[in-house]
Amino acid sequence: TSASNLAFSKPAYPYGTDHGYGLRSEIGTATFPTFESIREFIPKEDWWPLPTDEQLKNDPNTVWNKHFFGKEAWNAKPIDYKKAVNEQFGESDSLEEFCEKAQLLNMEVVKGMYEAWNDKMWNDASGLLLWMSHPAYPSFVWQTYDYYYDPTGAYWGAKKACEHLHIQWNASNNSIKVINTTAKDLRRVCAKAVVYNLNGKEVSDCSRIKWLDVSAGNIAEAFV
């Protein structure tokens, strides 16, 4: 199932655009490592609180900036990253708590990128390569697993979106599509969409099932 695609952005990105897909050879995001890794390279006295927005924008001397969470990595938008974690998953009281929540954002962002290309497979979307998988220096950007080889949420997001048979939601138009990246045609497979309320109870009137065929290396729309 899917619930990513950066739906919090206005418009939802990357689903909110209809151009610029093609074969992207270099794309990446800010990516917080796990707390276990961060404590290896950020001194304990600097753990908390995180740098202010003003520091992230202008201060070149923080230890965070030296590891690309600050003005040195302006193109990774550290202020927006911090804001997204806080707004989507709640304010944190410690670095450890923030790191745990950041992994959820890491997963959603990278899963959303791959799902956007899935959604337009062979329609101005032929491939996506991440920059990059692994940093040569302890860092807060461009990685799926960190300097210490610990996977971040970005790794698991990419793995989920790139599974051979995948079902996903488009945040821009609410369509549900089945993605088949295998070399085998699939006949009469079942797509099921389940809606839950805020108490975790299934809303049966809103749930749907559809049987469909999906050609090899292609996509099929299940619901809109």
Place the predicted regions along the sequence by residue.
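Substrate-binding clefts and catalytic carboxylate motifs of secreted carbohydrate-active enzymes
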Residues: 9-187
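Intrinsically disordered, low-complexity Pro/Gly/Ser/Thr-rich segments with frequent PxxP/GP/PP motifs
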Residues: 189-224
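Aromatic- and carboxylate-enriched substrate-binding clefts and catalytic-loop regions
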Residues: 1-7
